[in-house]
A protein has these predicted regions:
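Beta-rich carbohydrate-recognition and catalytic domains
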Residues: 1-164, 168-218
Length: 219
């Protein structure tokens, strides 16, 4: 756990002592110890327990400074909060760990997510990064050769707001879909990719292209 995550955990425990006394605080549906959460990410069953990750700001009740929170459960009702799985790598100009997915690759828990920073903005600079977990999924280490995918993978096709990978395996190959849009005119789209090892990816084609009437992006 990095220094930022340790600071976040201490802060959460302090705030949780206060918020759990709120009579209007939900008690049945999952929620973090305190502060902001949004998208659930990478739910999976691993070694007899359900794991859930989620977009999380451990320092404020507003969106921002996005980490990956992490919890596990045996019954999907009672949850144990685990240390923050992913924190932004400030030293690598990363300010947010956006949504993604978690899979098991040859026994190794593996997260693939969208990395955002000052020089890689959501519209035209997002990258896809990887992190590897230990056997208990309590500690995560970002892959030393990140990014594993950049916008250059599209070989001249202009893709914007490219984000939120979903990963699955069919036969010998891994596949990924990411959302975004094609500009000029804006057309929301889903893009398809293929890999034999999760590290090296090939862009196949736009899987879905919709009209602007459908919105700006598909996430």
């Amino acid at each position: 756990m990095g220094n930022l995550s340790k600071k976040a955990l201490e802060n959460l425990k302090e705030i949780n002592f206060k918020v759990k006394k709120d009579p209007q605080r939900p008690v049945y549906h999952f929620l973090p110890l305190a502060f902001w959460m949004n998208d659930p990410n990478g739910p999976l069953l691993y070694q007899g327990e359900y794991h859930l990750f989620y977009q999380f700001n451990p320092f404020d009740d507003k969106w921002g400074n996005i980490h990956w929170g992490h919890a596990k459960s045996k019954d999907l009702v009672h949850w144990e909060h685990l240390p923050v799985a992913l924190e932004p790598s400030k030293e690598k100009n990363e300010t947010h760990c956006f949504s993604g997915d978690c899979v098991i690759n040859e026994g190794t828990p593996t997260i693939i997510y969208t990395s955002i920073g000052p020089n890689k903005l959501p519209k035209d600079g997002a990258e896809q990064w990887m992190a590897l977990g230990d056997n208990g999924m309590a500690n995560w280490t970002k892959f030393g050769e990140n990014p594993i995918m950049t916008l250059d993978i599209h070989e001249g096709l202009n893709v914007e707001d490219w984000r939120d990978p979903f990963i699955w395996k069919e036969g010998e190959y891994w596949y990924a879909v990411l959302g975004g849009h094609l500009p000029k005119p804006i057309r929301p789209a889903v893009f398809l990719y293929k890999s034999d090892d999760l590290y090296n990816w090939q862009f196949l084609n736009p899987l879905i292209i919709k009209s602007r009437k459908s919105g700006k992006n598909i996430k």
